[in-house]
Every structure is written in C-alpha cells, then in structure tokens.
Amino acid sequence: MKKILLVLALLLVVAAATFLIFTEKNHGGSGRKTAYDAYAKGDYQTAYEIWLTSADKDSAAQYGLGKLYANGQGVAQSDSTARDWWQKSMRDIEQSRVLLSILPDPSDPQYTYATLHEKWQPAAAAGDADAQYKLAILYSTGIGVPQNDTKALVWFEKAANQNHAAAQYELGKFHEYKRGRCAAAQAIQWWEKASALGNADAQNILALRYDMGFHLTPHYPRDECRAIALREQAAAQGHPEAQTWLAQTYMYDQPQCNLVANRDKARALLEQAIANGGEHTRKQAESVLYALEHNGRYPTP
C-alpha cells in the first residue's frame, strides 16, 4: 500500500509538471496565453512586456524573451542576450537546452543566429545528418527562420534515417505531440532507436511509457522491468528526472524485476537530481526525499 501511495503521489507531481510544460508549449495559462497570442499576431512589444514582467520566476517567459532577442522581434537583435535568457531557462525548458546545444557562441564573428540557416543548408542538402538536425531545430523553434513544422519534419526524418539519435528523439516527440495517439507507435519506434544509441532523453521518456502504459499500443505492453532498465541508463548519464523516478523505485523491493530496496542509493540519486534538475524536477525530487525520510509520507502542499 505504501508503494502504491508513493507512486500515486509522485504521479501527481509529474502530472502537474507535465501540464505546465504542455501549457507552455500550447499557449496555456492566462499570462502565457496573452503573450503567445500577441507573439503569434506579430505584436512583439506586448509579448516582450508580458514575458519581461514574469521572467524572474517563469522559465517559459525566459525562453520567449530569448526567442525575441534571437530574431530581433520587438527588441534590438542580440545573440548574446538571447543566449543569456535561454541559459536561465535551460533546466526547465527543453527547447532552451536544445538551442544552446546547437547554436554557436555569440562571440564567434563568423556566425549569427540570423544567418545559420544559409550556413547549414548546403551541408544538410548534401546529406550531413547533423546539419539536417540543426535545420530541423531552427524550423521547429522559429529561430532565424519562420516556424514551419512541415519543413522541420522533413529534416528531422532525413537526419533520423541516418541514425542521428537526437533527431530520432525529436521525431518521436513530433509524432506523439503533434499527431497524437494515432502516431504513438511511430513515436515509440523512434525513441527505441534513439535509446539504443544512448540518448538519455529517449531512455527517460520510454521508461515513463513502459512504466505507466501511456499511449502504448498492444504491440508495446506495460513493462515495469524495462522501465527500470531504461531509467538506470538515463540516470547514469545524469538525467535528473530519470534519477528521481529511479530513486522511488529503490525505496521498495521490486521482486518481479529482481531489484532489492536500497534507500542509500535512492537518497544519492535524489541528491543528484536536486543538484542538477530544473525547478519542477527539484521539487519532485525534494518531495520524494521527504517521503524517503518520513516513512512514505509526502509534505503537505
């Protein structure tokens, strides 16, 4: 019973964080909706003012400000300022982490965010998988080019078919989040490929699907032991969310998976997640750590 309550409580925390990420991506929340609506209409000044007001606490606003500065929309274009905002939000906003991983240092005079498309296009057209992936990111985020999901999908597929793990992970997200449940099997297939190549994000998202059966087709039944194995791989690479979930697994024996409870390991994983995770992951890990130290009881909100 304790294990069930622990899992349910953790799921509530994860659901809240997932909802926040989903609403950030889909213009949810009154303030965010107003800012994103203004952005979509080309009213960049209004979007800027709204995002700036909440930027001290809102990572989604920080991401939005970075986009404005990168594209010079409503503000003076500044690659370095865009990068600064994305660095503030990178622990909570996946798009910020992805952009920071592909964009060159603003101090390099040979590159500006506005000209990256024309610099990467020839290599992408010639079949370079990394350039194809980078172009797809530009199109999917709308940095330096108009946001275009159709073009993003084309380049993600080209890179993914060349075993580019990050492109495979992004392509899986595209299938599930853009196309919905009908494409869940395709999403999982791409995540499986990325996971086999060592992509920690793919390992983590696959673990969640196998653990809870979210969107799984009959061809992909629930598999707790597979979920644990995937989280072990992702956690070993320092993935904070995987570390948090794996920690709660180690709080109790899992005989069906030949796993013996190890509260010391659980505590170590949670401490790593708290040190390295974003705001939502840190809160989740802190909640589980409290439960670990208080016989499964979670803190009162």
Outline where the language-model segments fall:
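Ser/Thr/Pro/Gly-rich low-complexity linker/stalk segments immediately outside membranes or between
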Residues: 22-36
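Structural signature of tandem alpha-helical TPR/SEL1-like repeats
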Residues: 42-46, 76-85, 108-119, 146-155, ...
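Positively charged n-region of N-terminal signal peptides that target proteins for export
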Residues: 1-4
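Short helix-capping/linker turns of helical repeat alpha-solenoids
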Residues: 31, 38-39, 43, 56-58, ...
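Hydrophobic face of amphipathic alpha-helices that form TPR/SEL1-like repeat modules
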Residues: 37-38, 53-54, 64-71, 99-106, ...
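Canonical positions in the second alpha-helix
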Residues: 51-54, 88-89, 121-123, 158-159, ...
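Hydrophobic membrane-insertion alpha-helices, especially the h-region
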Residues: 8-19
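Terminal, low-structured helical/coil segments at or just beyond the last alpha-helical repeat
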Residues: 272-301
